[in-house]
Regions:
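Single-residue signature of alpha-solenoid repeat helices
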Residues: 173, 207, 241, 275, ...
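Alpha4 helix (beta4-alpha4-beta5 surface) of REC/receiver domains from two-component response regulators
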Residues: 87, 110-126
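Conserved phosphotransfer microenvironments
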Residues: 59, 72-94, 100, 349
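Acidic, metal-coordinating helix/loop segments flanking the phosphotransfer/catalytic sites
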Residues: 55-73, 80, 205, 212
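Conserved acidic segment of CheY-like receiver
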Residues: 20-43, 74, 165
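Non-catalytic signal-transmission and effector/linker regions of two-component phosphorelay proteins
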Residues: 1-27, 31, 158-162, 282, ...
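Canonical tetratricopeptide repeat
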Residues: 193, 227, 261, 295-296, ...
Length: 444
């Protein structure tokens, strides 16, 4: 039936929709006044009571409203000052695990491939891209409501299974997904959700078979490919994982939460050009979490070490600069990056970075030892190396290499045997398990 902009509350055909909305609590979260007004008008015309309609232009207001009034119908703007509708969606899911009990719609400025894929991945009810017309928007809202009112047995069973997954009842969820397989001629989602349930239960080989079954039905379906990638990574079948990751990249916009797995597959297979491509993608993201920061930073560091090993110092320098940007100032990566820069002779960058680095980084063992190793490789005089090693020990850092540098340097400087023996004794006291190595310098 065609639906025009005028919605007749009294029409018999519309009674199920009117009844559905009569007691729904609705929350509209949108930064644009024109969008808010259009959405408000639509919901009012569809019969939502004013007392049940909450509207805000602020994410800060939206979160407490979600927690307080617990709306069952939410329309939320995609991005709010680096906050997103998906954060609100997670709250809604925690309150109402069964997706049949709620409607969640995202509004956005554009239907980008990445956003469309995220909507599909999360199985959100709809995406409305601005500018939208009143008639088209109302039509879509009614279509979504009708789909909730008359779900197929297949969709209802999937929702029951997903609700159990959200509640942590994994085995019960798996049984629902197995049941759903027989309720549709093309049960791609049932196979995929069963696969993820089996992954949670650590039934990795069984999960792998589920994802492969979904791919037989739909060879390029994202959930099946992403699940299969996860299985291969867990089983350390890295070449297979890499091949699946290439298929994901070729056929789909990469989801940020899947990027760590793609990076790991590329690193483990030595496909470092891919890691650099993932960095370019990473830099375009509005939101990144710690897992993603850690993955791309570690991946770039491994890539730079590979480049240095093959003698491509220029490429390594570029990669290290990228790692410096990607790590977002995290000390654990800054230390390694700076240490690699020192070994790569990137003196200009080192001075610049150290000037703004926190003391935790500047005075870390990784940086001090990297500086010493660089001076050793550069052929610095034994006297200067001994001086550097002694300064590092005085700073509280303990490392067997420091004592070896002091002992070997002192021998080269032809210091008095008594002094050298005292240094060896001190080294043996600090690291008794390495006494044989230290005393070996005296024998030589």
């Amino acid at each position: 039936m065609a639906i025009e902009s005028g919605f007749d509350l009294k029409a018999k055909a519309n009674k199920p929709i009117v009844d559905f909305l009569a007691n729904q609590k609705v929350l509209i979260v949108d930064a644009f006044s024109a969008s808010r007004n259009t959405l408000r008008k639509i919901m009012t015309e569809l019969g939502v009571k004013s007392a049940n309609l909450e509207i805000t232009d602020s994410f800060g207001d939206a979160e407490p409203k979600l927690l307080g009034i617990q709306p069952t119908f939410v329309m939320a703007d995609y991005v709010f000052n680096k906050k997103s509708a998906f954060e609100l969606f997670e709250i809604t899911k925690s309150q109402f695990p069964n997706r049949l009990d709620t409607i969640f719609i995202v509004t956005a400025d554009a239907e980008t491939p990445l956003l469309l894929n995220r909507i599909e991945d999360e199985e959100i009810d709809g995406l409305f891209a601005r500018p939208f017309t009143y008639a088209s928007l109302q039509r879509r809202v009614i279509e979504i409501i009708r789909s909730k009112l008359t779900p197929s047995p297949y969709y209802r069973t999937l929702c029951d299974g997903r609700a159990r997954m959200t509640l942590g009842k994994i085995e019960e969820a798996m049984l629902e997904f197995v049941k759903a397989r027989n309720l549709d001629p093309n049960p791609v989602l049932a196979w995929c959700h069963e696969g993820y349930a089996r992954l949670k239960l650590k039934h990795i080989e069984a999960a792998e078979l589920c994802f492969k079954e979904s791919l037989k039905l739909e060879p390029k379906n994202y959930k099946g490919l992403a699940g299969l990638l996860e299985c291969y990574l867990v089983r350390q079948k890295f070449e297979d994982a890499y091949n699946v990751s290439r298929c994901i990249v070729a056929e789909h916009a990469v989801r940020p939460r899947r990027l760590p797995g793609l990076i790991r597959a590329a690193v483990m297979c030595g496909r470092f050009d891919d890691v650099l491509q993932f960095y370019d993608f990473y830099m375009k993201l509005d939101e990144v979490d710690d897992t993603l920061i850690n993955s791309i930073s570690a991946g770039l560091l491994v890539c730079s070490k590979y480049q240095m090993k093959r003698g491509d110092q220029a490429a390594a320098a570029i990669t290290l600069r990228k790692a410096m940007i990607a790590c977002k100032g995290k000390a654990i990566y800054l230390k390694e990056i700076l240490a690699s820069m020192i070994l790569n002779g990137m003196s200009d960058e080192i001075v610049s970075v150290l000037a703004s680095a926190p003391n935790e980084v500047k005075n870390s063992e990784e940086i001090r030892m990297a500086e010493l190793n660089y001076q050793i490789q550069a052929g610095t005089s034994p006297g200067r190396l001994v001086e550097m090693a002694m300064d590092i020990i005085k700073s509280g850092i303990r490392n067997t290499k420091l004592y070896e540098v002091i002992i070997s340097g002192s021998i080269k400087m032809k210091r008095r045997p008594q002094i050298i023996e005292e240094i060896v004794n001190e080294a043996c006291k600090a690291f008794p398990e390495h006494a044989k190595t230290f005393k070996g310098y005296l024998a030589a």
